[in-house]
Design a protein with these regions (language model features):
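Active-site loop segments of alpha/beta catalytic cores
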Residues: 2-227
Length: 227
C-alpha cells in the first residue's frame, strides 16, 4: 500500500531507539483529514467543507465514518510495527462551532479510541484539537484520551486548574520561539516547565516544528529539558 513505508519506518525506529525513548505514532484526525480532502489544500475559512458538513451532515458523516475506519487501521498497524503510543492531530478543530466540534471532532475520536482499545487496551492515546479554547476541557473529559496536546494560546494556569486533574497535558511552546531562540525562547520554556511540571506533563511544541528552525535551537531546547 501507499502507506507501507510509514510502517517500515516505524519498525526501523523501534529497533534502533533506546529503551528509555518512547516512539509515538500519529495520524490526522478525521475532521482535519476531511478538510484537506474536500478543500484540496489548506484553507482560511474552510467554506467548502463546512458547506457540506453543515448542509448535508448525513452525507458528510459517511466520509467521516470511512476516515474513522481507515484511521483505526493506520494507527493499529503503527502499533504493530512498534509505536508505543499514538497521537491524533486535529489541526482545524478550532474552525468549528461548539456543536460541530462535538459531532465532527470529539465523536469520531471517541470511535477511534473505542476500536483501538479492543486490541490495545493499554495503549496511551493523545489528542490534539488545536485552537478550541475552552473546548479542550470538554475534549479531555469526554474523548477518552490519556493526554491532550495544547496549542501555544492555551493559558497555563487554566491548564493546571481545568485539565491536569483529568489527563496528561503536552505542550505548548510557540514554534516561532524555537525559530527565534535566545532569551525569549528560554524564558518561555522555563515558564512552561515551572507551571505545568508539577502535574502529569510532556514538554512539546504547541504545533509542528517549522522548516526554518535552526537545529542548534532544537539542541538548546533538549539541553534545557535534560538539565
Amino acid at each position: 500500500t501507499k502507506v507501507a513505508p510509514v510502517y517500515e519506518t516505524v519498525g526501523r525506529l523501534a529497533e534502533e531507539l533506546p529503551d528509555n525513548v518512547a516512539l509515538i505514532g500519529f495520524a490526522g484526525a478525521p475532521w482535519t483529514v476531511a478538510t484537506y480532502m474536500v478543500e484540496g489544500r489548506g484553507s482560511r475559512d474552510h467554506a467548502i467543507v463546512k458547506q457540506w458538513a453543515y448542509g448535508d451532515p448525513d452525507g458528510f458523516g459517511q466520509l467521516i465514518d470511512l476516515l474513522v475506519t481507515a484511521t483505526v487501521e493506520y494507527l493499529g498497524k503503527q502499533v504493530e510495527a512498534g509505536a508505543e503510543a499514538v497521537q491524533l492531530f486535529d489541526t482545524w478543530a478550532g474552525a468549528l462551532s461548539e456543536t460541530a466540534f462535538q459531532r465532527w471532532c470529539i465523536e469520531p475520536v471517541q470511535q477511534i479510541i473505542t476500536q483501538l482499545r479492543r486490541n490495545y487496551p493499554d495503549l496511551p492515546i493523545i489528542g490534539f484539537p488545536r485552537g478550541v479554547g475552552a473546548g479542550y476541557k470538554t475534549f479531555a473529559k469526554t474523548a477518552g484520551v490519556n493526554g491532550v496536546s495544547l496549542d501555544w494560546t492555551v493559558p497555563l494556569d487554566w491548564t493546571v486548574a481545568e485539565l491536569q486533574g483529568d489527563v496528561t497535558v503536552q505542550g505548548n511552546l510557540d514554534p516561532r520561539l524555537l525559530v527565534i531562540g535566545g532569551a525569549a525562547m528560554e524564558a518561555e520554556i522555563q515558564r512552561i516547565l515551572e507551571t505545568l511540571g508539577k502535574g502529569p506533563f510532556i514538554f512539546n511544541l504547541g504545533h509542528g516544528i517549522v522548516p526554518e528552525t535552526p537545529p542548534e535551537h532544537v539542541g538548546r531546547l533538549a539541553e534545557i529539558l535534560r538539565g
